[in-house]
């Protein structure tokens, strides 16, 4: 995996965590 791919995954995870928290 390239650094760009890793950064994208990290951003997606962060967005998912924030969304989740907002739903709660």
Swiss-Prot record:
Homotetramer. The keyword Hydrolase applies. The keyword Phosphoprotein does not apply. Keywords: Cobalt, Hydrolase. It comes from Parageobacillus thermoglucosidasius. Belongs to the peptidase M20 family. Its cofactor is Co(2+). This is N-acyl-L-amino acid amidohydrolase.
């Amino acid at each position: 995996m390239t650094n760009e791919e890793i950064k994208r995954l990290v951003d997606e995870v962060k967005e998912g965590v924030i969304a989740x928290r907002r739903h709660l």
